[in-house]
């Protein structure tokens, strides 16, 4: 299922990137603006302690709060 979650803008200076497990999200993507608090609405599993879901382009990325290290990616979840 693909969701329309409204307007989205990348942080200034960042371009599309295909994220993978082990990558590190830059701090700009770890701001509250990109956090997905209602992850269950989008069919995402609860994040483990110390992680959160963030929207990056059309994807939902599960990343560590402290470091931004990517644990998982839900590809093309948004349009």
Identify the residue ranges that each predicted region occupies.
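Low-complexity segments
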Residues: 1-79
């Amino acid at each position: 299922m693909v969701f329309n979650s409204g307007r989205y803008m990348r942080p200034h200076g960042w371009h599309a990137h295909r994220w993978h497990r082990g990558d590190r999200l830059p701090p700009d993507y770890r701001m509250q603006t990109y956090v997905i608090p209602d992850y269950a609405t989008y069919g995402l599993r609860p994040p483990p302690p110390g992680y959160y879901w963030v929207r990056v382009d059309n994807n939902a990325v599960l990343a560590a709060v402290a470091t931004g290290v990517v644990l998982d990616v839900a590809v093309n979840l948004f349009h």
